[in-house]
């Protein structure tokens, strides 16, 4: 059924309202013990100050926060009184709202149509972002180490590129292990998924589990793993049987690197990785361009100086290549398209960039733990509202006008309308829909993705049919 834009946004408004209506927040605050009797600062006021009104709950002064709350809702509070209300129950309240939102149906109808969707029901992107917190919280949020990382919060996110649906989420200490979280995410896999993983989540066991569950993967290969390929000249016993230890030989990756031109791709046929535990898989080598090599060397120098991590000589020698492993069928994703498909994971970097540059989730002053956590979960709720709205707008703009939306531009514009959304949610879904229609009109006019650098966009790689500058574009996946 092809619904109108208004009907689509009305359904979205109803789902949003269902989780954030003032009466529901008041009831939830009582259930969770944040409010035990009628007070001037209740669940709706906490949500107002942490989600909607203040952009700097952790960095503005308490006097300023009291002023913002008074302007928005009327209650007059003292700085000391407000600070007391940032307690464990307040954190639990905001955490519950965020959990209910990201597990809701807000993004269930936001999936875009693409050639990639024919083969992969979900394209799962997993990554983490980390930021420092006050040093006195190091016992609660120990950092990841390195220079000035005594205390930090790490946020792990896995989401579906087609719909924007959050699949797995974790807020924890900066020292939390990426690989452990990646393994935990296996429980939510479904046949037909494609998982794109970077080096921090690399695990032979996890890749093997994906393969057994009918899930495809594309992953960078850690250089401490050896690649073996079928020996064209194996040794034989006198009876004509092949000597098992000569059936496969180790691949000289450095030698292959020197034979490739910048931007060239090479696939090692009939290969496996691992010594003790073998994983038979496709192995693809991509030769970086000179520009990409310079960028990588800069990152390596930064990592060595800031985080105290030393790269091995082998890693430095193989700086010029990316090695990918994948179990995707070659007829679905040929070797020439593997690097482009892997680059889809950089979309999550755009999401994380908005968290810091637009929402300033990493900004704080020296405050108590509960106020910092209220800030983090309040920001995450606002971020999810904006990102889920963006993914819905992206789907509608493609469906109705065949245009590609810029995720970064759109989230910024939606953030500018948070105060209007807040006022609408205090009333009804009809008013919310009006605000969303205004937003859609704005995004249609000013939110289109730029193609200035002639780089492939996410739509190009995924094989989405769309129009740009009046021309209809239909690119195969890559």
From Swiss-Prot:
One of its GO terms (biological process) is DNA transposition. It holds the Pfam family DDE_Tnp_1. The keyword NADP does not apply. GO terms for molecular function: DNA binding; transposase activity. Keywords: DNA recombination, DNA-binding, Transposable element, Transposition. Belongs to the transposase 11 family. Involved in the transposition of the insertion sequence. This is Transposase for insertion sequence element IS231C. It comes from Bacillus thuringiensis subsp. berliner.
């Amino acid at each position: 059924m092809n619904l109108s834009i208004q009907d689509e946004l009305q359904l979205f408004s109803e789902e949003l309202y269902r989780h954030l209506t003032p009466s529901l927040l008041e009831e939830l605050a009582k259930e969770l013990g944040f409010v035990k009797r009628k007070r001037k600062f209740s669940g709706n006021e906490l949500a107002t100050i942490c989600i909607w009104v203040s952009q700097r709950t952790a960095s503005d002064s308490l006097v300023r926060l009291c002023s913002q709350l008074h302007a928005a809702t009327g209650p007059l509070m003292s700085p000391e009184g407000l600070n007391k209300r940032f307690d464990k129950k307040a954190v639990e309240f905001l955490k519950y709202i965020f959990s209910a939102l990201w597990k809701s149906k807000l993004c269930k109808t936001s999936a875009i149509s693409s050639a990639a969707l024919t083969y992969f029901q979900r394209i799962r992107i997993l990554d983490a972002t980390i930021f420092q917190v006050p040093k006195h919280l190091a016992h609660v949020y120990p950092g990841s180490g390195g220079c000035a990382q005594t205390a930090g919060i790490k946020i792990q996110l896995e989401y579906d590129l087609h719909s924007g649906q959050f699949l797995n989420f974790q807020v924890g200490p900066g020292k939390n292990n990426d690989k452990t979280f990646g393994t935990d995410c296996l429980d939510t896999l479904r046949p037909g998924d494609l998982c794109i993983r970077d080096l921090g989540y690399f695990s032979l066991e996890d890749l093997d589990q994906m393969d057994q569950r009918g899930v495809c993967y594309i992953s960078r290969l850690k250089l401490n793993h050896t690649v073996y390929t079928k020996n064209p000249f194996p040794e034989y016993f006198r009876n004509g049987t092949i000597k098992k230890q000569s059936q496969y030989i180790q691949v000289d990756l450095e030698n292959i690197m020197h034979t490739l031109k910048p931007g060239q791709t090479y696939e090692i046929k009939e290969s496996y990785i691992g010594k003790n535990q073998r994983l038979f898989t496709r192995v693809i080598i991509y030769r970086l361009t000179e520009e990409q090599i310079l960028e990588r060397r800069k990152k390596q120098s930064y990592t060595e100086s800031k985080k105290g991590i030393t790269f091995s000589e082998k890693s430095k020698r193989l700086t010029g290549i990316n090695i990918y492993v994948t179990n995707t069928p070659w007829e679905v994703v040929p070797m020439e398209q593997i690097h482009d498909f892997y680059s889809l994971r950089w979309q999550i970097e755009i999401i994380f960039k908005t968290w810091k540059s637009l929402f300033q989730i990493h900004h704080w002053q020296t405050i108590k733990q509960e106020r910092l956590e209220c800030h983090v979960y309040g920001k995450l709720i606002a971020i999810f509202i904006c990102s889920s709205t963006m993914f819905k707008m992206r789907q509608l703009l493609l469906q109705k006008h065949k245009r590609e939306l810029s995720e970064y531009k759109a989230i910024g514009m939606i953030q500018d309308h948070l105060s209007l959304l807040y006022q609408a949610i205090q009333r009804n879904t009809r008013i919310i829909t009006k605000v969303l229609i205004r937003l859609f009109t704005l995004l249609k006019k000013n939110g289109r993705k730029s193609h200035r650098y002639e780089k492939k966009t996410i739509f190009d790689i995924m094989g989405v049919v769309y129009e740009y500058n009046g021309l209809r574009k239909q690119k195969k996946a890559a």
